[in-house]
Amino acid sequence: MTWRATVLTLFPEMFPGPLGVSLAGRGLAAGLWALEARDIRDSATDRHRSVDDTPAGGGPGMVLRADVLAAAIDAADPVPGRPRLVMSPRGRPLTQARVAELAAGPGPLIVCGRFEGIDQRVIDARNLEEVSIGDYVLSGGEIAALALIDACVRLLPGVMGKLDSSAEESFSAGLLEYPQYTRPKSFEGRPIPEILTSGDHAKVAAWRQAEAEALTRARRPDLWAARSVARPAANAPAKGESQKTPKNKTDG
C-alpha cells in the first residue's frame, strides 16, 4: 500500500508546493508516496461556503466550525484507522521518533487550521492529535503540514538516494548531526580537519560521534539529558575525562 498524506485546508493550491521538487517530488512522481489536498469549503452547506464563525464568549478573530470540519474529515477518512493530526502551536512537539512512526504507517490525515483556531468539539469528537513544529505561531497549518510530510516522506523506501543518509542525520540517533566538510581542502585559511582526510574509517567514525555528542550537549541539553537517561553508561565520561566541548582544528 502506498503511503498517502491527506491534507484538509482552505488553501489546497499550497500543495504539493515544495514537496513537488527534489527527492520528495521525484518520489511523488514515481508513485512512492501520494498526496491529496482537499478544500474544507467543499463541506460547507450554505451558499457562501462559510467555514468559520465568531468565538463563543467573545474575542478577536474567527473560529473554524466543528460541523463543517467534521464533515470534511468524515468525507476524507470515512473509515477511521489512520492517524488524524491537526497542526497547532499548543500541540505536542513533533519529534523524529514520531515522524518515524508516521512514516511506518499508512500516512496521516492532516487538518490545517486558520483564523483563531478550531472548535474544540471537533478535535475531541474526531480524536485529532494536536502536533506542533515549534514554539511560534504561523498564519495557518499549511507550512507546518508541509514540514511534517517532508520529514516523513524522506524516510520512505526508495525516496532517499543513499540508504545511510537519513540514519546519520540529526535526531536519528538522539544526537545532532556532526559537522560536514567538502572541497576545497582549505577555505579562507580554514582547512578540513585532518582526520577526515586520513582514510582511517574508525577514527573518522569516532571523531563524528564525539562531535555529535559535543554539539548535542552544548546546543540541545534537553536531547542530551534524554539520551543520558536512556543510555547512562554510554554517555558517562571516562574516569578523569572532562565534559568540555572538543574544538575542531578550524576553531582556532
From Swiss-Prot:
It comes from the Bacteria. It catalyses: guanosine(37) in tRNA + S-adenosyl-L-methionine = N(1)-methylguanosine(37) in tRNA + S-adenosyl-L-homocysteine + H(+). Residues 229-238 have a biased composition (Low complexity). Residues 229-252 are annotated as: Disordered. It is found in: Cytoplasm. Its main location: cytoplasm. Keywords: Cytoplasm, Methyltransferase, S-adenosyl-L-methionine, Transferase, tRNA processing. The keyword Heme does not apply. Specifically methylates guanosine-37 in various tRNAs. Homodimer. This is tRNA (guanine-N(1)-)-methyltransferase. The gene is trmD.
